[in-house]
Amino acid sequence: MYLRFANRKPYEKLHLSTALEDWDMSEELKLSITADQYFAGADDKVERYTLRRQHSTEVSPTRSEEGDYQECTFRPSLWLVVDPNLVIPCPEWINRIPPEPELTSPPLQLQRQLSNDYSTVEDSEDEAPTSCSDVLTDDDDSYNPWQPKHKRKKAKCLGKKLRVQKGLTQLESWPRPPLNYCNLISLALRNSEDGSLNVQQIYSFVREHFPFFRIAPDGWKNTVRHNLCFSSSFEKSSGWVCADGHRRSCLWKLTRQGRRKFRNEMHALSDDLLHVLRKSMKKPALMELMFGM
């Protein structure tokens, strides 16, 4: 995603500067696991991270010129603002941002042609479709040729709104899959061609095979990223994705422990959960093949 600014100089000066200094580091370091990953023995893991955090946040004394110890006022910052074009330049994208098109006046010959065709444009304006109008067939209930034109436009907009609501209702009929996010990520990775995907590809896999996440709030994406970073079931591979001008993103793959954990948890699912899982999939016929059952 590229952002356009009227004046980029103030933002370029923020390179290698700290930001969000009021971020609560103590609360951030507590997020060792998510609620859906709260398995047996998670208390020990939380205590281990808590002890590590307490040890790292202890104030180290420093000796002053008089020989007395003073407290160090330095506080680490979690966020560092960097310019990605300087830190990780993408070789396939030489021109980072396409130039803005210049607004120039049309040639004189074109202006004369437009002035001559002005009456034709006025006559065709009434027939131009609006932004919310679609091609309606005879079976559309919102169409009535005897209505005034402005009422027909409102009816067309209402008909499109009803069709959109009908589509959302169909998506809402899909149940949520009875799997935690760690298993969803493992399912996406084990069904990839080379066993590795980036974050966006994992999102696409989940939305494609489980329609529930197509209309779910985007908070589930944050949970996916959190599990990738903190779960021992995943690790970064040595490959990078950088094509079609997109920023390079790292690839993730399953660890040996992650494969074993996914296989054991899938075989431990009850018949009721398997029934719900099958109903939540867009293509339930691929369930045995995708899950290795």
From Swiss-Prot:
GO terms for cellular component: nucleus. Residues 106-119 have a biased composition (Polar residues). The keyword Cytoplasm does not apply. Keywords: DNA-binding, Nucleus, Transcription, Transcription regulation. SMART domains: FH (SM00339). This is Forkhead box protein N5. Gene3D superfamilies: Winged helix-like DNA-binding domain superfamily/Winged helix DNA-binding domain. The keyword tRNA processing does not apply. Residues 104-152 are annotated as: Disordered. Signal peptide: none annotated. PANTHER family: FORKHEAD BOX PROTEIN R1, FORKHEAD BOX PROTEIN R2. It is found in: Nucleus. GO terms for molecular function: DNA-binding transcription factor activity; sequence-specific DNA binding. InterPro entries: Fork_head_dom, FOX_transcription_regulators, WH-like_DNA-bd_sf, WH_DNA-bd_sf. CDD domains: FH_FOXR. Residues 176-273 bind DNA. PROSITE patterns: FORK_HEAD_3 (PS50039).
